[in-house]
């Protein structure tokens, strides 16, 4: 009887002895699971943040692609090989411009002419800029020659075509290569237009204000007042071309005078501090 009781009690006693150990094991297992879960969560978080990286990389790549496209789209600067006559004419006009403005520079060639124009554009008011250029043009040609041309070549088909042809032969050093084109004057075809595919002066400055105040306005005034020939200069600021139409009066509401300067491409403003408002 005692043996049976002992045998029956042993399993219960054994079970009772095992429960604390099992509970401890379960607790340790639970704690380890919690710890592992926490560690996994912490380790997982840094991996969640880079998920947006591809989007940023895509945006950066797109921006770089845009910049590269714009750079690739920019046309290369025209290279000019000036002859001895070109250099002589450029130096002569540059010196007259410097004397009229009182602003000297030590540069050579076309760079000297552009530097003289930049100095005028930086310092003087818009009206004064055109006045100085007109004075420089009058200095460049003796008054008796101007008077002789004005008297001997009154406005006519011949004089209009003569001025156009003369410009294409003797002034490519100033404006770049150009050619004579036809237009209709009083119902007749005349070769009175000079077409400049890319103006050298405009390309060198990339400035609308300098084009209008230091070239277009004073040249129109000088040719009409000193040579007796009406002329309308019509620049195209999209492709830097220009047309000189001899015999045509500039319109009062000239669209070129309303054109804002290039916001990001103006070399004169970005590199030389020119106020290119027109």
UniProtKB/Swiss-Prot annotation:
Entry annotated with the keyword Iron: yes
One Gene Ontology term of the molecular function aspect: beta-carotene isomerase activity
Tissue specificity of this protein: Expressed in young leaves, axillary buds, inflorescence promodia, lateral roots and crown roots. Expressed in vascular cells in the shoot apex of the main stem and young leaves, the nodal vascular anastomosis and large and small vascular bundles of the internodes.
Entry's EC annotation: 5.2.1.14
Alphabetized InterPro entries for the sequence: D27-like, D27-like_C
GO cellular component terms listed in the entry, alphabetical order: chloroplast
Catalyzed reactions per annotation: all-trans-beta-carotene = 9-cis-beta-carotene
Pfam families: D27-like_C
Main location, first listed in the record: plastid
Necessary cofactors: Fe cation
Record: transit peptide: 1-40
GO biological process: secondary shoot formation; strigolactone biosynthetic process
Cofactor note: Recombinant protein contains about 1.7 mole of iron per mole of protein.
Taxonomic superkingdom: Eukaryota
Key word DNA-binding present: no
Compartment(s): Plastid, Chloroplast
Consequence of gene loss (knockout): Increased tillers and reduced plant height, reduced levels of strigolactone.
Keyword list, A-Z: Chloroplast, Iron, Isomerase, Metal-binding, Plastid, Transit peptide
Functional summary from the UniProt entry: Involved in strigolactones biosynthesis by catalyzing the isomerization of the C9-C10 double bond in all-trans-beta-carotene leading to 9-cis-beta-carotene and providing the substrate for CCD7. Strigolactones are hormones that inhibit tillering and shoot branching through the MAX-dependent pathway, contribute to the regulation of shoot architectural response to phosphate-limiting conditions and function as rhizosphere signals that stimulate hyphal branching of arbuscular mycorrhizal fungi and trigger seed germination of root parasitic weeds.
Miscellaneous section: Recombinant D27 protein expressed in E.coli contains about 1.7 mole of iron per mole of protein.
Record protein name field: Beta-carotene isomerase D27, chloroplastic
Organism: Oryza sativa subsp. japonica
Gene that this sequence comes from: D27
